[in-house]
Curated annotation (Swiss-Prot):
Produces ATP from ADP in the presence of a proton gradient across the membrane. PANTHER family: ATP SYNTHASE DELTA/EPSILON CHAIN (PTHR13822), ATP SYNTHASE EPSILON CHAIN, CHLOROPLASTIC (PTHR13822:SF10). Belongs to the ATPase epsilon chain family. One of its GO terms (molecular function) is ATP binding. It holds the Pfam family ATP-synt_DE_N. It is found in: Plastid, Chloroplast thylakoid membrane. This is ATP synthase epsilon chain, chloroplastic. InterPro entries: ATP_synth_F1_dsu/esu, ATP_synth_F1_dsu/esu_N, ATP_synth_F1_esu_C, ATPsynth_dsu/esu_N. SUPFAM superfamilies: Epsilon subunit of F1F0-ATP synthase N-terminal domain. It is a peripheral membrane protein. Keywords: ATP synthesis, CF(1), Chloroplast, Hydrogen ion transport, Ion transport, Membrane, Plastid, Thylakoid, Transport. The gene is atpE. One of its GO terms (cellular component) is proton-transporting ATP synthase complex. F-type ATPases have 2 components, CF(1) - the catalytic core - and CF(0) - the membrane proton channel. CF(1) has five subunits: alpha(3), beta(3), gamma(1), delta(1), epsilon(1). CF(0) has three main subunits: a, b and c.
């Protein structure tokens, strides 16, 4: 039995295919979803989506949004998303270093909040590349 997973941004479809299982980062922690999961709607945090296809795990960096799960259908609408395999490791590492520097130079609450969000996004992209398959 499988799940139909659709990952969308406002501009494009990132993924639309059948999967065996997912592990999703929500605002209240990670959840695993298998076929016949109870219906839920949840906020999606900045974090990693792990997708199992048969014996292979894939990763995606998700940049916050919403998910709807029910009837073996999962729809995830996020601000932005990238497959781990599509992320350039050197560019992601540079972005992480810049985000860390910007956070240390942030002045005031607004700059600190924006710099912290940029750092979370950068760390998520690096993690999507480096995550070890289950």
């Amino acid at each position: 039995m499988t799940l139909n997973l659709c990952v969308l941004t406002p501009n494009r479809i990132i993924w639309d295919s059948e999967v065996k299982e997912i592990i999703l980062s929500t605002n209240s922690g990670q959840i695993g979803v298998l076929p016949n999961h109870a219906p839920i709607a949840t906020a999606v945090d900045i974090g990693i989506l792990r997708v199992r296809l048969n014996d292979q795990w894939l990763t995606m960096a998700l940049m916050g949004g919403f998910a709807r799960i029910g009837n073996n259908e999962i729809t995830i609408l996020v601000n932005d998303a990238e497959k781990g395999s599509d992320i350039d490791p050197q560019e992601a590492q540079r972005t992480l270093e810049i985000a860390e520097a910007n956070l240390s130079r942030a002045e005031g609450k607004r700059q600190a909040i924006e710099a912290n969000l940029a750092l979370r996004r950068a760390r998520t992209r690096v993690e999507a590349i480096n995550v070890i398959s289950y």
